[in-house]
From Swiss-Prot:
Annotated organism of origin: Prochlorococcus marinus subsp. pastoris (strain CCMP1986 / NIES-2087 / MED4)
Pathway: Amino-acid biosynthesis; L-leucine biosynthesis; L-leucine from 3-methyl-2-oxobutanoate: step 2/4
EC id: 4.2.1.33
A molecular-function term among this protein's GO annotations: 4 iron, 4 sulfur cluster binding
Catalyzed reaction equations: (2R,3S)-3-isopropylmalate = (2S)-2-isopropylmalate
Xref: PANTHER family: 3-ISOPROPYLMALATE DEHYDRATASE, HOMOACONITASE, MITOCHONDRIAL-RELATED
Cofactor(s) the record lists: [4Fe-4S] cluster
Record: residues binding [4Fe-4S] cluster: C347, C407, C410
Keyword Protease: no
Protein's UniProt name: 3-isopropylmalate dehydratase large subunit
CDD domains: IPMI (cd01583)
Length: 469
């Protein structure tokens, strides 16, 4: 069993009690909620005449179902209007901080919390959303929970969990030019398999991880769940502290130095013990694209669709289904695959650095005539910053639609959907069957830069052909 890792330290600090059956009762330092998984939880509190235990440790925003084309109230979508109105009323009743549309701080919950300084090293963070692992980029232990656990956290600020094992993923060397965090994490999931992380927390480390910006680290941790891990984290360092300093909710003045000193003490010790260690050479990673129906089914842009015996054993069970659904054959090149829709956004890649990279590719270029392309900033703050830098004009001039913040086509709960058997180049995190709104829609996951390149050519392309000119 792991010893003296950051995960062990944070877990032990937040363990309230040992429970019958071997699980632990864990205190949650920050509870993030949104409009989709919270209504039933609040309803359960009302049924039992309970109040939120620590409303000051709960923060809400709207993201999943909000329209990105027209956010004037009331929304055209009655369900969206109802869900957001319900969250607003629940937050007022229970005195919970709520960042609504137009507040300047609304957006995807996993984008908003870090940019406000709510996410901090050493925290336990829970949210009714799979990609809560994003916050582990700051050295927190963050995990998605179901609606019943959302209820438990609202009522008690604790949940029952079995302690996870810890696997260190050591990324040697550095990423090459034109290779991004999205490429690296897709490669990791491909190498380990989509079930390898079950029962584990992933600690990402090594020179390649140290080189990444905080926003790139969030991309890595965001997709931990796609490799089966309940959470993923990175030890905090000077980049972490620099990013957090002077954020709205970060410690201020003399409390800042005290906080940094404590955060540094949480780092995995030199003599810590991991349950497993996986090593890879980051310098060998190519621009990576999914070809199948799990994030583990990915290849480099210049590679061919693998045959069954070339696929990781953990992924073989759906490989044949993926061939049929995606209309790919073993040995077929992924490069030059025609694209219909290009989407840049999501909690994985909807931050300002993602938009900057994509805009650099798009500048002085035009979206192909057959392509529908749109960019959805991850938050109102990201949108504001992008407009100040003129990024919105670059996207619009190239032929992209500029949208308002929200989850959008990542999960297609609003009107942003694929139609029929359209193929999308998407910077989101999941390529499951029907994920982007159409039962027959096909999703190719890739970095924002690769999406931008695909939008120009109308097909899967190597972004290095654009940035190395």
């Amino acid at each position: 069993m792991s010893q003296d890792t950051l995960f062990d330290k944070v877990w032990d600090l937040h363990k309230v009690a040992n429970l019958p059956g071997g699980s632990d009762q864990i205190l949650i330092g920050l509870h993030l909620i949104h409009e989709v998984t919270s209504p039933q939880a609040f309803g359960a509190l009302k049924d039992k005449n309970l109040k939120v235990k620590f409303p000051q440790r709960t923060v809400a925003t709207v993201d999943h179902i909000v329209p990105t084309d027209n956010q004037s109230r009331p929304f055209k979508d009655n369900l969206a209007e109802q869900m957001i109105d319900t969250l607003e009323k629940n937050c007022i009743e229970h005195k919970i901080k709520f960042f609504n549309i137009g507040s300047g701080n609304q957006g995807i919950v996993h984008v908003v919390a870090p940019e406000l300084g709510l996410t901090q090293p050493g925290m336990t963070i829970a949210c009714g959303d799979s990609h809560t692992s994003t916050h582990g980029a700051f050295g927190s232990i963050a995990f998605g929970i179901g609606t019943s656990q959302v209820r438990d956290v609202l009522a008690s600020q604790t949940i029952a969990m079995n302690k996870l094992k810890v696997r260190q993923i050591w990324c040697e060397n550095k990423l090459s030019n034109g290779i991004y965090a999205k490429d690296l994490v897709l490669h990791i999931i491909n190498q380990l398999g989509v079930k390898a992380g079950v029962g584990y927390a992933y600690e990402f480390a090594g020179p390649a991880i140290s080189e990444l910006s905080m926003e790139e680290r969030m991309t890595i941790c965001n997709m931990s769940i796609e490799g089966g891990a309940r959470c993923g984290y990175i030890n905090p360092d000077e980049k972490t502290f620099s990013y957090m300093k002077d954020k709205l909710c970060s410690p201020q003045n003399e409390n800042w130095e005290k906080a940094v000193k404590w955060w540094k003490s949480l780092e995995s010790s030199d003599n810590c013990v991991y349950d497993d260690v996986f090593k890879l050479d980051a310098s060998k990673v190519e621009p990576t694209i999914t070809w199948g129906i799990t994030p583990g089914q990915s290849i480099g842009v210049n590679q061919k669709i693998p045959s069954l015996n070339q696929i990781h054993p953990n992924d073989q069970f759906i490989a044949e289904e993926a061939y049929e659904y995606m209309s790919f054959k073993p040995g077929q090149s992924i490069k030059n695959t025609p694209i219909d829709v290009c989407f840049i956004g999501s909690c994985t890649n909807g931050r300002i650095s993602d938009l900057r990279v994509a805009a650099q590719v798009l500048e002085h270029n035009k979206v192909a005539k057959n392509i529908k392309a749109f960019v959805v900033p991850g938050s109102e703050k990201v949108a504001k910053e992008a407009k100040e830098e003129g990024l919105d004009k670059i996207f619009i001039k190239a032929g992209f639609q500029w949208r308002e913040p929200g989850c959008s086509m990542c999960l297609a709960m609003n009107s942003d959907k694929l139609i029929g058997n359209q193929v999308s180049a998407s910077s989101s995190n999941r390529n499951f069957k029907g994920r982007q709104g159409s039962p027959n829609g096909r999703t190719l996951l890739m970095s924002p830069a690769m999406v931008a390149a695909a939008s120009i050519t109308g097909k899967v392309s190597d972004v290095r052909d654009f940035i190395n000119k």
